[in-house]
Amino acid sequence: MSNRKSLTMIVAGLSTALALTACSKTVDAVTFPTASISNVAYSEQEAKQLPSDGTITEAGVYKVSGNVTKPITVNAPKDASVVLRLDGATINSTVSIKQAGDVVLYVAGDSSISSTDGHGVDSKSNLTIDGPGKLTVTSKDKDAIHSDENLTVTGGTLEISAGDDGLKAVKNLTIDGGTMNVSKSNEALEALNVTINNGTVTTHSTDDGVNASLDDGLADQNATPSITINGGMVVGIGSGGMPQTPTVGQGWVQQNVTVKAQDRVKVTDSNDAEVVTLTAEKAATSLFVSTPQITEG
């Protein structure tokens, strides 16, 4: 294994094991466009009020705040750019994006989305999450955040709990910034191509922390799944049924561990400087850590 640096893992217990998994199928690669949002104002002054029935049918910035009990649905023209400006919103149903060009969840203030019978966010369009605030997304049985197209995170603090996958995109899942904690999931991050360029990602999963696969029938079956970490800090823990590490990107270390629920694990470098300390939510057997400071040697 390349790009590895000696790290001491003190297993008084930890929760980390981004079981990185990629499908072994090797075929011609395909490139999908990433979400592109431009000339859209995110300010509160420019934002419209959410329609009373919760259905958005045209482009624009929409303010969502307070307790929202009706489903929020975006069903706009295919070329429409829609921004949902979440500011102190408590949304007690699925946010359903049926059609639009690109959609942004801009997290201006602490907000939450909770669903008991569907995905927390269910998008059939390109979806981007950004903003300075905190967003908590909970799905009892399904994915917390799901996109049939591309899913990009560029900012915000995300607290994710899912009955199935934490963040799932059929095509590309890209993390360009922000802080993300997937506290409960089957697979924390899943897409055809998973790329992490910046930010802090912590995962707790019963299966794979990061899974790049063709499992979803909507994915292009001629594509090659890939996992790339170019920056930021990624720490994960899980059972790691098919642990596979990134083929390109920054340095990483992966270690088999025996960790019980509520154990703590401290990871230090060769100079005894702390890299990360976490508490395991559940028993785990695999620990993965990737940071820009990890180099070969």
Predicted regions, residues:
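A composition-driven surface/loop motif
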Residues: 5-297
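N-terminal secretory signal peptides that target proteins for export/translocation
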Residues: 1-3
